[in-house]
């Protein structure tokens, strides 16, 4: 049995793919930005679901910025990021209903709570996060490590009944700051 999953490639499309398909005259536009290039990004996801949605998948939902960055960057407010991610999830769920199965509950979906995404899930004292959002009903929430093998977060008692359940992302190797390591060579 082999299980492979692209953890941060929404709607069966890879960021590396976008890098090669983007451009001024591309049907996908030239910016990995859901605000300024909504039509192009939506088309990119749509084509991924048309191509791969008929196969057995765990479809990643959500969006990050390019190269593992925050979706709107650090200058944007927490609320701006959360509102944008809600819009992204709504768009992706609509595409999944259209091209994979109208019954979202029958489609395995996953949101990775990377360090760039985790604050949007929880929110803060003044800003409601995505926790409990209907767009995430049935979505597996993938918890992530801190690049040192420690979980960044665990479900609270109130979260244990989340319909999509939980998964875990764990680095077997990591190349980047603050340190690079490999467990296997």
PLM features per residue range, with description:
Residues 20-22, 30, 116, 122-124, ...:
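Intrinsically disordered, low-complexity regions enriched in small/polar residues
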Residues 1-50:
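Hydrophobic or amphipathic alpha-helical targeting/insertion segments
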Residues 26-30, 66-78, 172-184:
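Glycine- and acidic
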Residues 37-163:
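Gly/Pro-rich turn-and-neighbor structural signature
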